[in-house]
Amino acid sequence: MKKALKIIGRILLALVIVIALALGVLTAAEYRPAAVETVTADHPAEAVLKAEEPLTLVTWNIGYGALGDNADFFMDGGTGVYTADRERVQQNLAGIRETLAGLDADIILLQEVDIGSDRSCRTDERDTLRDVIPGASDAFAYNFNSLYVPFPLPPIGHVESGLYTLSRAEIREAERISLPCPFSWPLRIANLKRCLLVSRIPVEGTDRELVMVNLHLEAYDSGEGKEAQTRQLQTLLRDEYGKGNYVIAGGDFNQLFSNTDSPYPVYEGMWQPGIIDADAFAGGFSLLMDPAVPTCRSLDRAYAGADPDGFQFYMIDGFIVSENVRVDGIETVDKGFANSDHNPVQLRFTLEEDIT
């Protein structure tokens, strides 16, 4: 009996040592970005932005090329971790590229773009998407960078993923601005480190800039993380608008705007998005979503072959636009969630010349 207890004790001690070593390695390798980091804006474009010219902007969470209509995901109540093999990742990326090319946008804001993650077969997805705007200027910022995510079973593994902005006009300057992380150690070490990717595009004939903010705010938190990140976003937008710049924030807010009447009720037991109070942005900004088509679907089960009636949909992708930007239209483009668990959202707008 004593011998058996000793063996069990040694096994438990060995497990504790292995876990401690693993936590030590992951802690030492934890991604710790500075509050503000300069991002290299690659591939200088030749086009310029002008006031009073119609422009088109698209935002799309592309689900790291692995969350097509076949996918379910464990964090949403499904069982999937690795949801696409290499062939399916390439199929999804090809569909995403085709859609973006057809939309012919001047600026594209993408979220969940993997550049070397196990979950998307170590694919650098920028290689497929970079020239969807010919001659585009582009910028990338990490939103998720972990040596190894050790959960669930099988574990997610290595992740390198982030926000990716493309512009027909030159991005003169870009920055990664860290957002508050709601998680403490040890969850923090293998979790997302969310940010704002701020790109500055000069407006010809003026000393103003179009300040583009690409974002993907907190999803699986108690709600405090989303709120803190939204407050920081609000401060940034007001500061830039106060300088006389044109300001647009677009992306996956993981929240519904309070001024949007969503026709998609949240069913019992499903993930619940937060709410952004539109009144908090009053006096300078408009919050825009198009509820005609859902921007996101639940990943509790695959969408292919499912009955849309009773399926969980959400409105969580959209734009916040300063008052000196005239909104000419907004549309959620219905792609049937074929290649991502989100639909792209298109904004047509004009930078107003007279902003006095």
Q: Residues of each region from the PLM?
A:
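N-terminal, active-site-proximal structural segment of metallo-dependent hydrolase catalytic domains
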Residues: K2-D131, G135, F140-E160, E353-I355
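Surface-exposed cleft-lining segments at the edges of enzyme active sites
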Residues: T79-R86, V113-I115, P180-R188, H216-E224
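Beta-strand-turn-beta hairpins that frame and shape the catalytic cleft
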Residues: A47-L57, D69, V159, L163-E173, ...
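Active-site beta-strand/loop signature of hydrolases that rely on acidic residues for catalysis
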Residues: T56-I62, N92-R122, L166, S199-I201, ...
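Solvent-exposed loop/turn segments at secondary-structure junctions
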Residues: Y64-G65, D114-S117, F144-L147, I171-R172, ...
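Short aromatic-enriched loop/helix-cap "lid" or pocket-rim segments at secondary-structure transitions
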Residues: G68-F73, R122-T123, P150-P154, R176-S178, ...
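Metal-dependent phosphoester-hydrolase catalytic domains
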Residues: L5-I11, V18-A45, R200, T235-I248, ...
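Conserved S-adenosyl-L-methionine
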Residues: S137-N145, A174-P180, G329-V333
